[in-house]
Design a protein with these regions (language model features):
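An amphipathic alpha-helical interaction segment
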Residues: 135-138, 144, 149, 156-209
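Short loop/edge segments at beta-strand edges and connector loops
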Residues: 46, 152-154
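Structural detector of well-ordered beta-strand residues that form the stable sheet scaffold
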Residues: 110-111, 132, 151
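Short beta-strand and adjoining strand-loop segment in the mid-core
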Residues: 120-133
């Protein structure tokens, strides 16, 4: 399998290097399994003969125009831009966009993580497809690319020839998925050597206040929830207190966060419950009561459904 990894000016250093390291590890271990795949042919490519990363390191690249044959997979690691406006500006009208479209139309599989997902979305290849991105970029991604079926709670989304991964160190999951799609056994071995565990969801790492802060109504909603965590809550009553209609609140949470008002309430409660579990000696029942659940089984069920772990595991991780 031929894999081209894009190195661009301003690339996120660890994202680029971890993709290369996972693939190199796969190559070094492939003889350790029965019927291992052929070696991965990895090419670092770009728009010129060198690229300067976000930390100023110079990386030699094979220009896309000089590639002798098409890769099977084209990987776009993240850029080091740290705010949504800078990311959007960096990607808008970038010369890589035309290449992405051309490669995809030629049958090449595309993979991207974190801010790199903005390249795929900006090129249009993600329209009508499910995808993920870094959790803190969800609101900006949703606003700019409404035709993409974004689920930013997921760490990895594979849809045909399109693979997207979440926040910065989801580059590991992205690279490992490329290995696993060709050889599950080799992928498992690589994950063991590199001590990579399954991380199906990035929701546990999201900061509700940061996500809501992109919209004044949602910022007020988030503050109101935290001020009344232990109290019974009706969305219609909260909307009235915020001076908006329930429908307006529903539209805002859907457009910015991709969830319902009740889902957001549950996320804020889970965020506080996680904090209490990890920083206090309160019993599980006391924590449940502190975040508005009279029955601890309700909190247990919510943790299992949304974080995919047990309450005890949440406390110790």
């Amino acid at each position: 399998m031929r894999i081209a990894v894009a190195a661009l000016d301003g690339s996120f250093d660890s994202g680029l290097s971890v993709v290369l390291d996972v693939l190199a590890t796969a190559n070094s271990l492939r003889d350790d399994i029965t019927g291992g795949p052929p070696p991965y042919e990895v090419v670092i490519t770009g728009l010129a003969t060198t690229a300067r990363t976000g930390h100023g390191l110079s990386v030699e690249t094979v220009p896309l125009t000089a590639m002798e044959r098409l890769p099977d997979v084209f990987v776009v690691p993240a850029l080091a831009a740290k705010t949504p406006p800078r990311i959007v500006e960096a990607v808008r009208n970038h010369p890589l966009l035309e290449w992405i479209h051309t490669l995809y139309d030629s049958g090449v599989a595309l993979a991207a993580a974190c801010t790199g997902t903005f390249f795929l979305a900006e090129s249009g290849v993600l329209d009508g497809h499910p995808a993920t991105t870094s959790w803190w970029l969800g609101p900006a991604f949703r606003n700019r690319f409404p035709a993409v079926g974004l689920d930013d709670s997921r760490t990895l989304v594979i849809d045909g020839r399109l693979t997207t991964a979440g926040a910065a160190f989801a580059h590991i999951d992205l690279a490992l998925s490329i290995v696993r799609q060709q050889s599950p056994a080799l992928g498992d071995l690589v994950s063991r050597y590199l001590v990579i565990g399954d991380r199906p969801s990035q929701a546990a790492f999201a900061v509700p206040a940061l996500l809501a802060g992109t919209d004044p109504t949602l910022a007020a909603f988030e503050r109101w929830i935290r001020d009344h965590l232990a109290e019974p809550l009706l969305i219609s009553e909260v909307a009235t207190k915020l001076g908006v209609s329930e429908r307006t609140l529903q539209r805002s949470t859907a457009a910015v966060l991709g969830m319902s008002p009740l889902d957001f309430v549950q996320e804020v409660r889970l965020d506080q419950a996680t904090f209490l579990l990890r920083t206090t000696d309160l019993t599980a029942s006391a924590v449940a009561a502190a975040v508005g659940y009279q029955n601890v089984s309700t909190l247990r069920s919510l943790v299992r459904r949304r974080r995919r772990v047990t309450l005890n595991a949440l406390r110790t991780t």
